[in-house]
Amino acid sequence: MVGYDPKPDGRNNTKLQVAVAGSVSGLVTRALISPFDVIKIRFQLQHERLSRRDPNAKYHGIFQASRQILQEEGLTAFWKGHIPAQILSIGYGAVQFLSFEMLTELVHRGSVYDAREFSVHFVCGGLAACTATLTVHPVDVLRTRFAAQGEPKVYNTLRHAVGTMYRSEGPQVFYKGLAPTLIAIFPYAGLQFSCYSSLKHLYKWAMPAEGKKNENLQNLLCGSGAGVISKTLTYPLDLFKKRLQVGGFEHARAAFGQVRRYKGLMDCAKQVLQKEGALGFFKGLSPSLLKAALSTGFMFFWYEFFCNVFHCMNRTASQR
């Protein structure tokens, strides 16, 4: 299970093994879902309606956007910003899972609460994600800039992007969108961890004995379900974050349609509601749900997989 397990037969992974499992989980998951992330970001940053009826809309559907990106920018466009994204995923995965395991253990040892309760997993999951976000947010800004730029490219390399952004916008550029990110990530990650735990209990209750044997499938399905639930409930804040992160980068967005400037989180929400309607808060939701199902499913699947591998290694070593 994810989180501290007080049972005597629970996993006995070291802190380093937990961090490595989280890192590898993030690395593999990111490589697999990068195309969905690029499409999602393009949708979120488009001010025109995602509809065929709007003649000014560059993108209006997942398949149409995929074809257009492929035709205009080539296959590698689906992995734009992949290097900063991988750095982000590796660091984020390590810090998030390590923090979560330590926090749930702290709750178990220092309070009367059960470390496996829904509310405990929600709070610990949210705090763990906020810790990871503070650690890797500058890389997230770089990833968004790379994924958002079209052709010709504004940034050619990671080093070029860092230097250009620092000189033209100052050091604060690397923490653009931090407030909505933290506001969004706490409930999102909290729901991921708590829903994953709850869905696993529900799965064990609902499935016949034969279906319980395949633990890897169980982890994948429950992780996917947790991803869909958490993403749907917190999606508007993710959209605000992306809009704010490309502030000052409007010249590179000219080829994608309208360009707007936002003074902050509340101004962004107000402008989206006034000019794009309530549905504007959910632009890019369809690729986001697909991405959330895959990414969260893979995240928990690979994390549990590698933790189990380390657990088996530890048990074998102790028996020698």
From Swiss-Prot:
InterPro entries: Mit_carrier (IPR002067), Mitochondrial_sb/sol_carrier (IPR018108), Mt_carrier_dom_sf (IPR023395). GO terms for molecular function: antiporter activity; thiamine pyrophosphate transmembrane transporter activity. A motif (Substrate recognition) lies at residues 241-246. Keywords: Antiport, Membrane, Mitochondrion, Phosphoprotein, Repeat, Transmembrane, Transmembrane helix, Transport. GO terms for cellular component: mitochondrial membrane; mitochondrion. It is found in: Mitochondrion membrane. GO terms for biological process: thiamine pyrophosphate transmembrane transport. Solcar repeats lie at residues 13-106, 116-202, 214-309. It is a multi-pass membrane protein. It comes from the Eukaryota. The chain crosses the membrane at residues 19-39, 87-107, 122-142, 173-193, 220-240, 293-313. The modification Phosphoserine is found at residue 51. It catalyses: thiamine phosphate(out) + thiamine diphosphate(in) = thiamine phosphate(in) + thiamine diphosphate(out). Gene3D superfamilies: Mitochondrial carrier domain. Belongs to the mitochondrial carrier (TC 2.A.29) family. Mitochondrial transporter mediating uptake of thiamine diphosphate into mitochondria. It is not clear if the antiporter activity is affected by the membrane potential or by the proton electrochemical gradient. This is Mitochondrial thiamine pyrophosphate carrier.
